[in-house]
């Protein structure tokens, strides 16, 4: 076997011939074995292959070469015993190449199979390096006189076959050298036309190379010979496109194809198409697409009508259902004796309000009237049974009630009033107090008020309630009360100067502290007095205005008797001397259960109050607890025959007549309220009210309201908060900051000033005179 070099070696010398010695690499054992087994029997030479990488055909070709004898002699001169050294020097004693002194084609030729783009990168540097190594090695060999190692590998009487001579090297390299396989045709549709063009142009480049290197080394001639037989072994710029040279790729940027827009988009053209996309699509729309567009438009318009237009027209009352009119007419014809009055032409849709009438439909017929003090029957004008489950009372949620989100600082309460603590459940309105930290306060509770929504000027207000916790435990402050609409409960800026005034005179009673140095009053004076000057801020000049308070119930407990106590009172200003009214005109009906309160008032209000004991079963906890009891007030505001009567259950507790508030000292008559009165229900806790027995208050505690009902005399129905003779709406709208900002505690802090009066202001009034 002859050895083919698989490495890249280039050699250059002055004789244009560098021979690489072919080394036999037999091991010591193999040499001894072959010495005996390969000994010719007839004296002929034995063919011994020096290259294990050649097949038998290649071996025969090499062995039969005409220059075999010369090559065998060259091979025997330099040989190694058994070691293999993988140096690239052709004259190394371990080289795998045969000595090719007479082969000009082999001189400087890289024997790698690959002759493409990447093979030419370091061609020049490789030649220089190999030439340098070759010259150094030749100098070493020439200086050596020891030829023993050259003949060491040559067996006695045997000659190794030599490589072909230099004359046949070109034929050998063209026919026997392993060439690069043809490239994989990634684009089979390219066709032979482009292949032929590529071959033709490649051959032209090769010919130009030959002419340029006519006087060059034999290495260039050999490269040309190899390249002429293999298109892809030339020094071409190969691209990754299936093996084709990039310069011969069939497409250029100037050529156009139908699918160019997929892989080579035109930015300007795409921008033009984007701007005209809708118009072009609409212009080329087929029948099916047009019908689809109409369907989408129809669904869009239908959605607008159903979810926007229809709710708007039904909420505004534009849509008037004839079925509703027919039902109303039928109901009217069946009860010809019943007279009904329409409050408004507005038609409330079912989803916009829970109710469409002032009287709750759940109110039983037996509760439609109430017997007054004089024996007359007053009509039910408003009721709320709270039977609708899950009502909420955030601002704007309910027609009649609002749950404020405030701290009630007027009485230094320990809780925060939150709308979250108010709801309806099991047919009752629940005000729940729990030990829940809220706004840096440790308790949360609820309040509802009908301020500026539902008011009344006279009548009977009845509330059925179950009071919180145990009846014998003191500390909680449940309240059911009314106050004039000019003051909003919990908003101190709005109540300054109007609470609890009910006064129509222009004297010391309207001045700060009632002009008394003994501290009987700390009030700032009546802000809206009867003698307010012209062009001053007043809702209706010439009328004394205020916000008096009437308490239906304020709950507490008698720890000695172990029962609950209801405080029922009228709170007014200005004050009597020592806060004492004329008790000759106060009537108590049962002294075993009711007595006048020893607390008659203080520097902020005069309280005409009585206390009544309550059954512990009317509370939330305790044996046989859970029962509801009704509490009520009934009053008329006539200056001569007016009165206020308080009730626990069906029985009156006491009555205050208008004459008990006659002039006293330097003040004039205090009047039973003619103001529109709003209703308030709340559950509070404060050290200003009673001793708090913390260990026996089992939070959470709940005050439950079964119903609220309002009765008024026939012909005197007034449930508005803005009556003609005592208006409030315009005045409130002019001072919204004071009525909607609970953090403001002073009228001037809200940005307003007290109006002047003719008594202290040095001005005049066209509506009132002192003489």
UniProtKB/Swiss-Prot annotation:
List, as start-end ranges, the regions of compositional bias called Low complexity: 14-37, 76-93, 126-152, 159-177
Return the annotated region ranges for Disordered: 1-112, 126-186
Membrane topology qualifier: Single-pass type II membrane protein
Q: What does this protein do?
A: Required for synthesis of the major beta-glucans of the yeast cell wall.
Bias kind Polar residues: ranges? 1-11
Q: Other notes on this protein? A: Present with 468 molecules/cell in log phase SD medium.
Q: Which GO terms describe its biological process?
A: (1->6)-beta-D-glucan biosynthetic process; fungal-type cell wall organization; negative regulation of autophagy; sphingolipid biosynthetic process
Fetch the Gene3D superfamilies from UniProt: 2.60.120.200
Q: List the ranges whose topology is Cytoplasmic.
A: 1-289
Protein encoded by which gene:
SKN1
Q: What are the GO cellular component annotations?
A: endoplasmic reticulum membrane; membrane; plasma membrane
This one is known as Beta-glucan synthesis-associated protein SKN1
UniProt topological domain (Lumenal) ranges: 311-771
Q: Which UniProt keywords apply?
A: Cell wall biogenesis/degradation, Glycoprotein, Membrane, Phosphoprotein, Signal-anchor, Transmembrane, Transmembrane helix
Which species does this protein come from?
Saccharomyces cerevisiae (strain ATCC 204508 / S288c) (Baker's yeast)
Which positions does UniProt annotate with glycan attachment?
337, 426, 513, 590, 615, 743
Q: Where is the GH16 domain?
A: 353-716
Q: Does the keyword Transmembrane helix apply?
A: yes
Spell out the subcellular localization from the entry: Membrane
Its main localization is membrane
